[in-house]
Amino acid sequence: MNIHEYQGKEILRKYGVTTPKGFPCFSVDEAVQAAEKLGGKVWVVKAQIHAGGRGKGGGVKVAKSLDEVRKYANDILGMTLVTHQTGPEGRLVKRLLIEEGADIKKELYVGMVVDRGSQRVALMASSEGGMDIEHVAEHTPEKIHKVFIDPFKGLLDSEADDIARKIGVPEGSIPQARAFMQGLYKAFDETDASLAEINPLIVTGDDRIVALDAKFNFDSNALYRHPEIVEMRDLDEEDPAEIEASKFDLTYISLDGNIGCLVNGAGLAMATMDVIKLYGGSPANFLDVGGGATTEKVTEAFKIMLKNPDIKAILVNIFGGIMKCDVIAQGVIAAAKQVDLTVPLVVRMAGTNEELGKKILAESGLPIITANNMAEAAEKVVNAAQGK
């Protein structure tokens, strides 16, 4: 689960991390009132969406008068903001963050992520703040410094100080940087975050360490322990199809292809997408119906997939272990009839009640294309999507 920048900063402040003063706003008038409340002569008007690259897309503006605050708030609220992370369709901006301006002397990067290789939280830091960290990793990897944090000891003073010096924190600001990194780690650990990024972390003109931005992702499997974080969820920022799928315990992720996939098991689902790509096709989604899918769940899965107008064909790939092939066959037929299926449908199933499932499909009277293995299924669905 993702949250907005202003929500991430609320979490950081609870752990002693310094951030600019600011207020979330949902209207132009609220934005002006927030600037008046903050005082000063410079404010930053920031679009709040779940994507990076907002500044380059025109979603972050520096205002030097209340009139400019009003103008920029009016421009940004309601705009469709397109960044390298939103895709060409962009995101509709429905909320803003109005912050006090900052005197920036140096921009740094600090992030944390769960590292599967070391089975620890990895702290990553760079002197190249304000840039896309993937770009830095590709072109100047020597500028990224890492610490793999021992969960029993936490981030040690010596580790934090060493990282701070490597990324160019002024010597007099090292204690602040240490406190920041240890606060960030504590926030990461106690909220069950899967990713935290501060980009940029700045050194101000008077050598203060301030988190100018904040990005948090959380482990969805741990949200039951954090109702206060669940309350931060913004459904407007999520794919409606993924929200609908979650209501039926379906794991659904939208992709940009034209072949719908309905599979049981995450591993088989990924293998199915790989084989589709191998045969020249492009999957439109990842959809795992799980091991205990019912006819109702399969029907709902079809409905969700077919809301995507780009889908030209559907592949159902089922291994009947806990999931029986005859149940899937009944669900496929019910779904095809209920949604008035108009795109080609390829079904490959193997395992428990396989022959019964195939018999049910054959006797359904529907134009279902069957396949005996994954390669055959992928080839048939790719050809069908291409109108062959």
From Swiss-Prot:
Its cofactor is Mg(2+). One of its GO terms (cellular component) is succinate-CoA ligase complex. Mg(2+) binds at residues 199, 213. Binds 1 Mg(2+) ion per subunit. Pathway: Carbohydrate metabolism; tricarboxylic acid cycle; succinate from succinyl-CoA (ligase route): step 1/1. Transmembrane segments: none annotated. GO terms for biological process: succinyl-CoA metabolic process; tricarboxylic acid cycle. It is an enzyme of class 6 (ligase). The keyword Ligase applies. ATP binds at residues 46, 53-55, 99, 102, 107. It catalyses: succinate + ATP + CoA = succinyl-CoA + ADP + phosphate; GTP + succinate + CoA = succinyl-CoA + GDP + phosphate. Keywords: ATP-binding, Ligase, Magnesium, Metal-binding, Nucleotide-binding, Tricarboxylic acid cycle. Residues 9-244 form the ATP-grasp domain. InterPro entries: ATP-grasp (IPR011761), ATP-grasp_succ-CoA_synth-type (IPR013650), ATP_grasp_subdomain_1 (IPR013815), Succ-CoA_synthase_bsu_CS (IPR017866), SUCC_ACL_C (IPR005811), Succ_CoA_ligase-like_bsu (IPR005809), Succinyl-CoA_synth-like (IPR016102). GO terms for molecular function: ATP binding; magnesium ion binding; succinate-CoA ligase (ADP-forming) activity; succinate-CoA ligase (GDP-forming) activity. Substrate binds at residues 264, 321-323. Its EC number is 6.2.1.5. The keyword ATP-binding applies. Belongs to the succinate/malate CoA ligase beta subunit family. Succinyl-CoA synthetase functions in the citric acid cycle (TCA), coupling the hydrolysis of succinyl-CoA to the synthesis of either ATP or GTP and thus represents the only step of substrate-level phosphorylation in the TCA. The beta subunit provides nucleotide specificity of the enzyme and binds the substrate succinate, while the binding sites for coenzyme A and phosphate are found in the alpha subunit. Heterotetramer of two alpha and two beta subunits. This is Succinate--CoA ligase [ADP-forming] subunit beta. It comes from Herminiimonas arsenicoxydans.
